[in-house]
Amino acid sequence: QWGLSRAVLKPRISATAYGTYLLSPDLGLSQSDWRHLNEVGGLVQAFVPEVETQGELSLVFIDGEFSHAVRKRPARGDFRVQSDFGGRWEAVTVAASVRDFGEAVLLAASRSWLYARVDVVETSGGPILMELELIEPQLFLTPSAAVRLADGLLSRTRPADAASGMPPDRSSGVGLEQ
């Protein structure tokens, strides 16, 4: 009906690919699956075959700056990259063009986010957006990235020092809950 050989059907709100299906002419959904999607709402996304061969890149941004990236790959015979379904991930270095694409996606979201994850797939035509995760994404944090996230959170929640306009110095532990 949409001119797609395969499509991904997802609930409008979900986590960890719960309730996500790969649709093709020979695959159908049970009546209970259709009822569930009708209740929660859903969306259809063109299936990008590169997910099976190259995986999906997650670009993590903390306090408006690119932090790190991971490549998520599905288990053999599956299309979902989440570990709950056998997917695996590894830290990677991404090309500047891919990082620039992620930054452009965040700029289009027109807000300063404390954290964000931009999921993309690299195709012969360039990177394409799969999802923009802003609510509660898995961030694949390293210790240094966790510190940047904590610093960003503190700078947004602590009152600025009246004289300097800067957040309080936390290096001495002063002002931190013990």
Features from the language model and the residues they span:
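C-terminal active-site "lid" helix and adjoining low-complexity regulatory extension at the edge
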Residues: S110-W113, E122-Q178
